[in-house]
């Protein structure tokens, strides 16, 4: 369960990074 939660958090962070990068461009 802990591993799945970490993966979900990583995916959420990556999604935020992608949206942030697209906004700065």
From Swiss-Prot:
Its main location: periplasm. It comes from the Bacteria. GO terms for cellular component: periplasmic flagellum. It is found in: Periplasmic flagellum; Periplasm. Keywords: Bacterial flagellum, Periplasm. The keyword Phosphoprotein does not apply. Component of the core of the flagella. The flagellum consists of an outer layer composed of two sheath proteins, flaA1 (44 kDa) and flaA2 (35 kDa) around a core that contains three proteins flaB1 (37 kDa), flaB2 (34 kDa) and flaB3 (32 kDa). Belongs to the bacterial flagellin family. This is Flagellar filament core protein flaB3. It comes from Brachyspira hyodysenteriae. The lineage of its organism: Bacteria, Pseudomonadati, Spirochaetota, Spirochaetia, Brachyspirales. The gene is flaB3.
């Amino acid at each position: 369960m802990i591993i799945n939660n970490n993966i979900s958090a990583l995916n959420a962070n990556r999604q935020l990074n992608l949206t942030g990068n697209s906004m700065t461009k």
